[in-house]
Structure formats: C-alpha cells, structure tokens
C-alpha cells in the first residue's frame, strides 16, 4: 500500500491525483455500461465506450467515449468551492456551483451540457432550494462527490453539511463520513481491510450499522450478495467490498473492472471505488490507456493542482 508523506508537496499532489484521476477514469469507464449490461456478461474493458442518453423518451443518443458524468462534475465543483474558501465548507457556494453545472454545463466533460443528473440532486437544487431529507431520497448522489472533503481537513459535521445540500437524510450523510474516514486511513498507508474497519470505528453514529449488518468484514460476502444499485448503502457496501477484497481485486484496474462487472450503477460505483483504489495503490496504477481516453485531461490536472494546495500536513 502507498503511504503519503503529507509534509511533502509532491506527495500531496500525488494523493490529489489519486482521488481526481482515480475517480474520473472509473466514472468514464463505467459510464458506457450503466444499466446497459448484466452481471455475468462478457465485457471487453480494454477501451472505453460511449454512454447512451435519451434527449427524448424514444430518441437515444450515443455520446463519445471517455466522458465522465455528474459524479466527477460535482466533485470538481466541490473542489472549486473549497479552493475559493481556502478549504472551508461553504454550502451556499457549493449549491451555486452545482446549480451552474446543472443549468449551464459548467464543470462538465461535455461543454454546455450536464452529463447525467440524479433526481434528488435536481429537485434539491432547482425545485426545493434545500436538501431532501426523506428516507426515500437516500441515493448515492452525495457519496459520489464527497472525496475532496476527506483530504481537506473537513470535520464530520462539515462532511454532513455538504451532503445535506442535496441529500439530507442521516443515512446518506453518515455514509459520506464513513467514506471520508476510509480514504484518510488509506492515505496513511493502512491496508484496505484495516482502513475500512478503522473508518467504521471512527464514525460516531450507529445509523449505518442499523441499516446494514454487513459492513464489518464485508469482504467475506460472496459477489451474489453485493447489490450495485444507486441506494447509498448498496453503493457504500459495493465499493467497500471491491476495495477490501484484496485477493480478488489487487490493483486499481481490477477494482474498477470489478465495479463495472457488478453492473447496475456502474459509473458511480467505479468512480467511488476507483478513488479509493488509486489512493491505496497510487495514481501510477491507473492504466495509461484509460487515462489517455478520459475527457478533458487538462481540466483534471488543473483540479489536481487545486486540491493538492488544500491538503493539510496531517489528516
């Protein structure tokens, strides 16, 4: 496992690169398969394929390969907000930037168009003007973007406030807290299983263990028991299972390919698990072919630079 010396500017940039590029590549790879494949299908993942969207109910449109989706766009917008606030969480600013993405396609892999939008996120930002706290609104839309907060010294309260801009139910908020702790422990050099158990121990609220009794030692579960839906607990379990299942998924490529082969919400699960895998195995573990096929590399590198300046000397 890679251990990052946060006294070193080079290692801070390497950690930022792992999160930004590890997530974007997983997102772009998974986007072409979201709800288009079934578990057990034979898939050639050597190159990315384009995603399909519906501009009208009966009019599908194929987008170019390599585009990343709302998962990465909202992460980039969050990093931009944190950069403007010198690392502080500013929920009004976050909401404004996410709205700019939704309405004008800012922070998007496709100029002028928001690629992929979740229902809860859209309602919270464009209709309600506040986060949705219904138990039925526990999608993975805040978990998918929370990773920068793991690296910028955000408190658990700050992580939950950021989630609540769109996803305000306690389950979604605490899932974000748990994942941030997992990323921090991985960055310290802990092995994935140790990092996951320590992350669960750092969460001061029992709600996750109330809604899921499978989180501890989740790597012991067979694949048939892993659900790859957009429900935040399913996503959290799937990502933790992929990253901690070290005998089967022992590098970045294996983790992300495993995420896509689970089918279902392939882009988000590959994005979130890909961030953690790149932190654990280093950004150099991301296959160069996938990197070269990922949209807007200059923007991603700029975001890496932004995030690296926000990482404190100790997480």
Regions found by a protein language model. Give the residues of each.
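Structured, active/binding-site neighborhoods that engage oxygen-rich ligands
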Residues: 1-315
């Amino acid at each position: 496992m890679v251990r990052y010396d946060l006294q070193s500017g080079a290692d801070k940039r390497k950690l930022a690169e792992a999160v930004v590029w590890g997530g974007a590549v997983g997102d772009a790879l998974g986007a072409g398969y979201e709800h288009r494949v079934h578990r057990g299908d034979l898939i050639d993942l050597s190159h990315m394929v384009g995603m399909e969207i519906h501009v009208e109910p009966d009019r599908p449109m194929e987008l170019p390969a390599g585009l990343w989706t709302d998962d990465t766009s909202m992460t980039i917008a969050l990093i931009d907000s944190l950069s403007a606030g010198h690392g502080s969480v500013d929920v009004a600013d976050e909401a404004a930037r996410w709205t700019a993405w939704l309405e004008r396609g800012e922070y998007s892999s496709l100029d002028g168009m928001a690629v992929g939008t979740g229902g809860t996120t859209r309602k919270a930002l464009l209709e309600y003007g506040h986060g949705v706290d219904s138990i039925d609104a526990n999608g993975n839309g805040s978990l998918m973007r929370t990773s920068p907060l793991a690296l910028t010294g955000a408190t658990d309260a700050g992580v939950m406030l950021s989630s609540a801009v769109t996803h305000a139910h306690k389950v979604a908020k605490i899932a974000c807290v748990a994942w941030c702790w997992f990323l921090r422990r991985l960055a310290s050099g802990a092995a994935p299983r140790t990092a996951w158990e320590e992350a669960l121990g750092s969460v001061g609220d029992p709600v996750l263990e109330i809604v899921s009794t499978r989180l501890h030692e989740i790597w012991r579960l067979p694949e048939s028991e892993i659900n790859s839906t957009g429900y935040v607990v399913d996503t959290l379990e799937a990502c933790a299972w992929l990253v901690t299942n070290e005998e089967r998924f022992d590098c970045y490529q294996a983790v992300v390919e495993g995420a896509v082969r689970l089918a279902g919400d392939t882009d988000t699960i590959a994005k979130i698990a890909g961030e953690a895998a790149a932190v654990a195995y280093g950004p150099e573990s991301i296959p160069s072919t996938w990197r070269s096929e990922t949209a807007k590399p200059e923007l991603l590198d700029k975001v890496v630079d932004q995030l690296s300046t926000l990482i404190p000397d100790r997480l």
